[in-house]
Design a protein with these regions (language model features):
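Bacterial signal peptide processing site
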Residues: 17-20
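Surface-exposed short loop/turn segments
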Residues: 61-116, 122-138
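Post-signal peptide N-terminal segment of mature Sec-exported envelope proteins
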Residues: 25-45
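C-terminal motif of bacterial Sec signal peptides marking the signal peptidase cleavage site
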Residues: 11-15
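Positively charged n-region of N-terminal signal peptides that target proteins for export
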Residues: 1-4
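An acidic helix/loop motif centered on a single conserved Asp/Glu
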Residues: 42-57, 147
């Protein structure tokens, strides 16, 4: 029964039109397209973190092609206090990182994507100021990776459609 189930499942999947996103590995069209995306400098510490994460994710195979696209990113990094305690101190913070980005075709100047991505994280404020600052920085590092991953996903979908 199992011997029949696997080929049957393969036939059913082939009929539904699903195709692997990264077909062809590092030599496939999507991987080559991602490798041809140049990330413009992004302002600030959050910008440095997001840009590095984007560059890592866009050239995962180590292949760097001549730039065909430019990715412009504007960030909004906000840290706000929440949860007032009885002694009027803040007990919790929320760090929000939002990105507005555009993928520009360098040959034509056409904007391929104009979108936003973002994420947020909660931070406990503790009595140690050092621990709180460390938690804020860790949250920024984690959010940078999440936002970069969301941007790369949308860029991948747009390049695949082209």
């Amino acid at each position: 029964m199992k011997r029949l189930a696997i080929p049957l499942a393969a036939l059913m999947l082939a009929g539904c039109g699903l195709q692997p996103m990264y077909a062809g590995g590092s030599h496939g069209a999507v991987a080559q397209g991602l490798a041809s995306v140049e990330v413009a400098p992004i302002e600030g510490r959050a910008g440095w973190l997001v840009r590095n994460a984007l560059r890592d994710k866009l050239s995962q195979g180590g292949v760097q092609a001549d730039p065909r696209y430019r990715l412009d990113v504007l960030l909004n990094d906000k840290l706000e206090g929440l949860g007032l305690l009885t002694d009027e101190t803040i007990g919790r913070e929320r760090r929000t990182l939002r990105a507005r980005y555009q993928l520009v075709d360098l040959a034509s100047g056409e904007i391929v994507i104009d979108a936003t991505a973002g994420s947020d994280a909660g931070i406990d404020v503790v009595s140690s100021e050092y621990a709180t600052i460390a938690a804020e920085e860790t949250a920024l590092e984690n959010l940078s990776g999440v936002v970069a991953e969301r941007i790369v996903t949308q860029v991948t979908l747009a390049l695949r459609a082209r």
